[in-house]
């Protein structure tokens, strides 16, 4: 018998979240999605099977409302550009998320982080992803942290960028970052 506890998914409009939600529904879970713009969820075939809470994870009241009655919360939020401003925003969101999860007595947070060596010279984006995991892990709510390198699949930003370039350019001059070591997940 499927567990009918309520699960919160943040980042449901993203690549991973958009694929996670239907799997949770297929497993018999009730799903709530927090979205800054709830209309963006209307494009997903499962949108009428989930509860949608409009709000911003930077706003404590939005998180508190979204977490009421939830047993597990998926943290799939991240700054897309990766600059210092996004890094600071990510950390503020993580603090808010952890505090709200504690108040709501969430049983578990599941966080999708990045596979990094924290002793290396990290970009602001990677540093903030690592620190976000740290902030969540040291809250009073148990955390399962999944760490991935690049996630590549049809529809992912990286896949679409590579497809776009290879369809239009017969020869590419590769920038320095192209030669960085990576462990992609397909």
Give a label for each model feature:
Residues 19-23, 100, 135:
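Rossmann-fold NAD(P)-dependent oxidoreductase module
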Residues 103-108, 140-141:
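A short helix->loop->beta-strand "cap" motif at the edges of active sites that frequently abuts
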Residues 39-104, 114-119:
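NAD(P)H-binding glycine-rich loop region in Rossmannoid oxidoreductase-like domains
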Residues 164-185:
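A conserved pocket-lining segment of Rossmann-fold NAD(P)-dependent short-chain dehydrogenase/reductase
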């Amino acid at each position: 018998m499927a567990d009918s506890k309520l699960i919160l998914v943040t980042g449901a409009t993203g690549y991973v979240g958009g694929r996670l939600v239907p799997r949770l529904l297929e497993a018999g879970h009730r799903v709530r999605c927090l979205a800054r713009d709830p209309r963006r969820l209307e494009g997903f075939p499962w949108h009428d099977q989930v509860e949608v809470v409009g709000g911003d994870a930077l706003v404590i009241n939005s998180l508190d409302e979204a977490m009421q009655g939830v047993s597990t919360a998926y943290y799939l939020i991240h700054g897309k550009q990766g600059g210092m401003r996004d890094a600071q925003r990510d950390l503020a969101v993580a603090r808010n998320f952890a505090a709200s999860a504690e108040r709501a007595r969430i049983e578990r947070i599941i966080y999708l982080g990045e596979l990094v060596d924290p002793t290396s010279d990290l970009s602001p984006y990677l540093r903030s992803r690592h620190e976000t995991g740290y902030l969540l892990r040291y809250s009073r709510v148990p955390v399962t942290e999944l760490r991935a390198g690049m996630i590549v699949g049809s529809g992912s930003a990286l896949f679409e960028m590579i497809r776009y370039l290879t369809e239009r350019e017969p020869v590419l001059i590769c920038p320095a970052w192209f030669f960085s070591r990576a462990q992609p997940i397909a």
